[in-house]
């Protein structure tokens, strides 16, 4: 599947948000790249909406065409379109693996899923965009559990803080999805209403 593979720090600086998680280079220079990076530029309404859409795309590692499909589905669902969109993105398998503490970044989680290291409800899933459901059980494949990465992750999971809608069992590297997240439980710096306004034009 196509995905953005360019310099993450530069993209973070342009959108003024840490897209990676723990990006020290961004923390040192949290302003857009280039000579005019520190300058305060008057931003149009359209630019703000576009930036928010791009921010969501790059946080979750979603290409434009797929993101548009997410929005269309979110718009068809009952409730607030923006909140529906964020919940759908947060429910991606790669994001759940990241939130559970089995990967340092969403990009790494996407790679781990793509390489076939996880099973959902007993069935192998290697699609990062696979959306989990309430009561799903996610396990690391038995062969994969012997990898150095998962052995190290297992030690770190004991003290890991995970979202309330998930539960992690460190001894078995199991993730339990107690419920789908509510918007208030999703701690990303995103103004999803601006995305709704962008697509409503």
UniProtKB/Swiss-Prot annotation:
Residues covered by the S4 RNA-binding domain: 91-151
Top-level lineage group: Bacteria
Pfam family, one: S4
Keywords per UniProt: Ribonucleoprotein, Ribosomal protein, RNA-binding, rRNA-binding
Alphabetized Gene3D superfamilies for the sequence: Ribosomal Protein S4 Delta 41, Chain A, domain 1, RNA-binding S4 domain
RNA-binding found in the keyword field: yes
GO annotation, cellular component aspect: small ribosomal subunit
Family: Belongs to the universal ribosomal protein uS4 family.
Family matches, as NCBIfam families: PRK05327.1 (NF003717), rpsD_bact (TIGR01017)
PANTHER family assigned to the protein according to its UniProt record, in alphabetical order: 30S 40S RIBOSOMAL PROTEIN, SMALL RIBOSOMAL SUBUNIT PROTEIN US4M
Assembly information from the UniProt record: Part of the 30S ribosomal subunit. Contacts protein S5. The interaction surface between S4 and S5 is involved in control of translational fidelity.
Name under which the protein is recorded: Small ribosomal subunit protein uS4
Organism listed in the record: Corynebacterium efficiens (strain DSM 44549 / YS-314 / AJ 12310 / JCM 11189 / NBRC 100395)
Gene from which the chain derives: rpsD
């Amino acid at each position: 599947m196509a995905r953005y593979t360019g310099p993450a720090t530069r993209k973070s600086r342009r959108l003024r948000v840490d897209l990676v998680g723990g990006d020290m280079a961004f923390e040192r220079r949290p302003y857009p790249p280039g000579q005019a990076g520190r300058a305060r530029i008057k931003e149009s309404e359209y630019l703000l909406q576009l930036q928010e859409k791009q921010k969501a795309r790059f946080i979750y590692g979603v290409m434009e065409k797929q993101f548009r499909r997410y929005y269309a589905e979110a718009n068809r669902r009952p409730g607030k379109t923006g909140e529906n969109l964020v919940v759908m993105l947060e429910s991606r398998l790669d994001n759940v693996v990241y939130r559970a503490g089995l990967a340092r970044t969403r990009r790494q989680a996407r790679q781990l899923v793509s390489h076939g290291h996880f099973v959902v409800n007993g069935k192998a899933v290697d699609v990062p965009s696979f959306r989990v459901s309430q009561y799903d059980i996610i396990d690391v494949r038995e062969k994969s559990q012997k990898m150095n990465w998962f052995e190290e992750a297992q030690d770190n999971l004991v003290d890991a803080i995970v979202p309330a809608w998930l539960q992690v069992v460190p001894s078995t590297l199991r993730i339990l999805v107690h419920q789908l997240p509510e918007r208030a439980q999703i701690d990303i710096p995103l103004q999803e209403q601006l995305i709704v306004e962008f697509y409503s034009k």
